Regions:
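Metal-cofactor-dependent catalytic cores
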Residues: 1-152
Length: 152
């Protein structure tokens, strides 16, 4: 029997940040543009780097981080565009998949940065999220991404 938890999930939250100095904010949907990124996102630009177009993170990893650190940091504060539920993201590196109707390719793991550690005011953020900080993906087809979209 196939465990669908590993090959199909859903979009739980969507977040964008207009520039480096602004906080990431939750939105109900976002327009993904092939080769550019997410409309309204600070990294959105012509001929964008493949690995900078959209980022994802698992709510399960966020919950685990909060449990082991004794914190209650909201998912949006993990600075990723899409918070997923019910899908293992690490196994998707090098693969193409869909977020709703938008096709993406996972290029590499999204390693946590020192800015994230400083914003959490936690010593071991980078260590704890090293292999669970999400994915960096390229947008292969344009379209809207909505909360509750299926990831497959």
């Amino acid at each position: 029997m196939i465990c669908y938890k590993h090959i199909m999930g859903k979009v739980l939250e969507i977040g964008i940040s207009e520039n480096k100095s602004s906080k990431i904010v939750n939105v109900n949907d976002v327009e993904a543009i092939k080769g550019k990124g997410l409309v309204g996102e600070k990294h959105f630009k012509e001929n964008n780097k493949k690995r900078c177009q959209i980022t994802l993170i698992e709510i399960e990893n966020i919950n685990h981080y909060n449990k082991i650190t004794g914190t209650h940091i909201p998912a949006i504060n993990f600075l990723r565009n899409i918070v997923t539920e019910g899908i293992r993201l690490n196994v998707l590196v090098g693969k193409e998949f869909f977020i709703g109707k938008v096709k993406v390719r996972a290029h590499d793991l999204c390693r946590p940065c020192k800015n994230l550690q400083e914003s959490f005011q936690q010593k071991n953020t980078v260590e704890e999220l090293l292999y669970t900080g999400g994915l960096r993906c390229e947008i292969l087809s344009s379209g809207k991404i909505f909360i509750d979209d299926i990831i497959k």
